Amino acid sequence: MRRWLHLCALAVLAGCATSTPPPPTADGWQPLALPGKALTRYSWTEKDGRPALEATSERSASIWRKRLEPALTPVREVRFSWWVQHLIPGANVSEVDHEDAVARVIFGFGGDIDSLPMRTRMKFELAQALTGEAPPYATLMYVWDSKLPVGTVVINPRSDRIRKIVVDSGPAELRRWRDHRRDLAADFRLAFGEEPGPLQSMAVMTDSDNNRGSARTWYGPVELD
């Protein structure tokens, strides 16, 4: 039971993790470690003439996150882009044991945690004990999956407070920039069936730990319109 709770707690850490001070040029973005996981390497660079954050994952999982001031950050449209070198064999964001993604853009939302079921609150309490901060009430991810059709909504197999929307799939668009514009509020309603609370954080994540693989991805700016 304790191991199950620990795994579930890891699943809600997209919005809270062990942080290190941000580089001076990171504009508030910070690298975030997940307990017990090797670090994905993030570095500022350029890719095909665009400024980019390069993510290199070798059997690793960690996050690059920016906290937002909820009162000053209305939920609105978002623009983001990514450039993926290759897929991870066997990865599938809907399967517990294969839940890796070459590219994720992540948004954490506030809400009334006391309204959630007791089991969910227990996961949140364990996550807070592991990291020192409370996880978001709800987390929405845009992901690139190896096989799932574009538009698929996935409930995280370990925590239903994390939902994913597949916006790229398969190998056809590899090794080129993919630009996305999404209505964040509409996508939240689609994924969770409720209105979004205040926007608390945004992040990117490339991970390959569950499949013991590797991934290399470049992220363009994540911009709220």
Segments (PLM) and residue ranges:
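Short carbohydrate-recognition loop motifs
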Residues: S43-I63
